[in-house]
Amino acid sequence: MQALCKRPPHPRPPGRPRVSSARASAFALAAIWAFAADASPGAETAAGSMTALVQADWIEQDRRLVLPPRPIEPAPTAAAGTVATHEDAAGGCDGRKTGRFGFHTASGEQDPWWQVDLGRPVPLDRVVIYNRTDAPPERTARIQVQVAREPGAASFKTVYEHNGKVFYGSRESQPLTVDFSKAGVTARIVRLRVPGRCSFALEEVEVYGRDDPRVNLALDRPADQKSVGPYSRRRAATAKTAPAESVPPAHEPFSLAHIRAVVERGRRLAHRLGKITAPQRLAPLLAGLDDLDERLDGIEAAGGAAEPVRRDRYFEARRLLRQIAFCNPRLDFDRILFIKRHDPGGLYHMVHQYYGFGAVAGGGLFVLSDPFSDEPEVTNLLETAVVEQGRLAGRRLEPGSFLSPELSFDGRTILFAYTQGEGERPEWSPRACYHIFRVAADGTGLVQLTDGPWEDFDPCFLPGGRIAFISTRRGGYLRCGGSAPPWDSPTYTLYSMAGDGSDVICLSYHETQEWHPSVDNNGMLIYTRWDYVDRDTNIAHHIWNCYPDGRDPRSFHGNYPVKRESRPWMEMSPRAIPGSNKYVATAAAHHGHAFGSLVAIDYRPEDDGAMAQVERLTPDVPLPESEGGKAAIRGLMAYGTPWPLSEDDYLCVYDGRAANRGIYWIDRFGNRELLYRDREISCLSPIPLRPRPAPPALPERTTQTAAARAETPAAAATIAVMNVYDGDFQWPEGVKITALRIIQVLPKTTPPVDLPRIGAGTETNARAVLGTVPVEADGSAFFEAPVGKLIYFQALGEEGMAVQSMRSATYVHPGERLTCQGCHEPKHRPPSRQEPPLALLREPSPIRPAPDGANPFSYPRLVQPVLDRHCVECHRAKNALDLDGSLAAAHGWTRSYQNLAAKYGFYFSVSNGSINAGAHGGGRTTAGRFGARASKLLNYLDRRHYGVELPAEDSGRIALWLDCNSEFYGSYHDTERQTRGEVVLPRLD
């Protein structure tokens, strides 16, 4: 490609009067942006306009000067050698406060510590601890202060243990100050320790003595720490030799420290690229860096330079870095497909961003040619295109709004979504919804593939020839939606269709939203799923995968965080990295759009519910909603729609102001170069416009497509479990599982949140108990499965009560044979079974129906008759708890339900933040500690309570109710009829 390694435009240094540093920087940025904005529309292909945009971006990077900790590439210098513990520890007391870490022990170190030697025993006044705040600060919330009077002490005395309250650093001016002024503590060695496993890192530590409380005794004193890791670094004596990651923030525009950091990053980038490209291509550029470095020495020796000189040297360093970056052989394409699109209006929410009526008109489908040259050219691919087929035949796609472009593996065909964006808010009609279109890569043959009152978007070419996409066709509504603003919020999930738009089938029967399907290197379909069956609304919207025909949906990462703040809140736009087992995604917010910070995901390490499988690619931007809370989300929606080129290199869109995003090349070492920006509208979804290897086409194993039905006889769907005891949790001692209970989760069919209130837990699902199937003595099960229904399983003990329950769900398709190893089996351990499972030696079991009142679920039919037979009369006579079945005031429930459910029943709450709700929260079920086994009501169902003896069927009904979240309603409509005990079937199942 001719543009690779081409020198970017070298502007003439501007001559202007000298002004103050801050004012000059602001003036330079404003002038450059004004130059770009004043250019005529056709001039955006000219070198001057692109130069102005690139320079404006460089100035913005200098203004922000975010140099976060990141993996340091091995450089061809002595600096790449092993770092000693005392060398890294020196950064904890060097006086530099950057908001980032000053030292960093090994990741996940057991009981890590850092210490400083004051040189002599000193009566302490206070210790001031500045936390790093470019990563979750809560990791040090249990920090301890320990002391010793002599170096080499065999033991340390703990003189302070923090209470768990999160503290911060210099950026927030909220360090932890430990007061020893009246404690009588004397120490020579001051050690900070975090008990347990921790990736221990702090910004800075200061120690003050009682003799002179104004003097920081720890400053530049010898320090040490327990271990070093990949983020540890040698503290250099001068700024020239310091790695970029240790440079403090600039206090003036275009500081020499920042220029040297750019030079150092250029060297490291050249060293990386030298392994995959001809070194002679990089030699002149490295020589340029050396020459610049010498001139910087001269400036430093002369005591500095005026801002215009520093700016010129900074631009020179950036040009060299940009040239080195464009020598990257992974940038071996000369066209980039992308769309232009305004951020949607209305509610900032992950769901509402993809409703067509909220789209802002403008944008289109574009191609950026020669993106790595001085004069990239932008072409509107649909400028003269007219729809040839579909409702909009004969019309151009304007104004409207575009979304989610997709390129075929051979590079010849493009799919995208488009909405006219007309109508009211909200409105679901052909004119208001997104529909999928197809066009050739040269802009010809524009046809409409989908239409109707459904949102259809996020198309994805499947290797077998079909197209996966996201659609609202299944029906149902968001369970926590319809309140702010009061819009209906339809659910959208995975579908597929033939290449011509025919033969549309449902791939996912999930009851809440899914997004952004793509095909990974193994031919599997990956996508983001919001999964909150009986769980907090805000903890699980991460990557899932399934076969291209929808079979076997699995969460292989991130679905069960220990706490919400410990990892990305949400992961959007997932894509497989070429030649790798890793994936890239955007760490985004629940209460935001699909932008944020970029992460790489590796499923091979075991998931610790936090960051074990996650690497930050852009740590300059915190993880939205995880870090900074809800108020900071809009300002953190900076990066988005990453397209991986390798584990190191990516295309994406970015804007530091989270407003007008341009197309960038970035790498995971902090380099970022602007390729294109439109001053009027954001860019989205850059894709190299070229062929790429097709993943394997996995065979269909269901009979739902027209082609499959024609070739394969219809067969019942089945589910097999090899060994229910094979799990990554501890079963209660002596438990014997005899059956599986199968429960259907019903999609919400009424738009407003908690209308109706299904039960004591907020925002929970209506459900139906389909029945039970036997489990063999070896823990295996094999049974017929209902097609097209979202179901989950409970493992029942010998007495018929649930021991364990899923807090997720699955489904099967026509003809599918779903197999599970166990009950939440360990993903990183192979099964140990030697003999065939007993259940597979027989025919599949039919589902044994549940008692009346369980399907559909109905408290008045399932539970109230038991109370009427055994409890109501006695309670009424003794003026005890009212267990009458008459109507109560709240939610249309009966008196008995209102008095029993919340206090004596058991339920999981589903509201935002309920992960922290104790027994009603959490992310996973603790075996033997939920449902009937954990309810207070269980203590009143035997002879201990006034000699009560319930027949097995009646006690089973009560246990079933308790195991099923102690719900009241089983459908979302006709609540008065349900309260009267009438059978009300769900409208959508």
Model-derived features: positions:
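Beta-propeller blade signature
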Residues: 364-369, 433-442, 487-500, 540-551, ...
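Short, conserved, GDST-rich strand-edge loop motifs in beta-rich repeat architectures
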Residues: 338-360, 417-433, 469-490, 527-541, ...
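Multi-bladed beta-propeller domains
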Residues: 375-400, 440-454, 498-512, 547-570, ...
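Beta-propeller domains
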Residues: 343-395, 422-431, 441
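Loop/turn-rich, solvent-exposed surfaces of beta-rich toroidal or solenoidal domains
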Residues: 573-664
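Trp- and acidic/polar-enriched beta-sheet ligand-binding modules for extracellular glycan
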Residues: 104-113, 121-122, 133-241, 470
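Aromatic- and Gly/Pro-enriched helix-to-coil junctions and flexible linker segments
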Residues: 38-73, 245-257, 289-294, 298-301, ...
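Conserved beta-propeller blade repeats
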Residues: 398-409, 453-467, 511-526, 561-577, ...
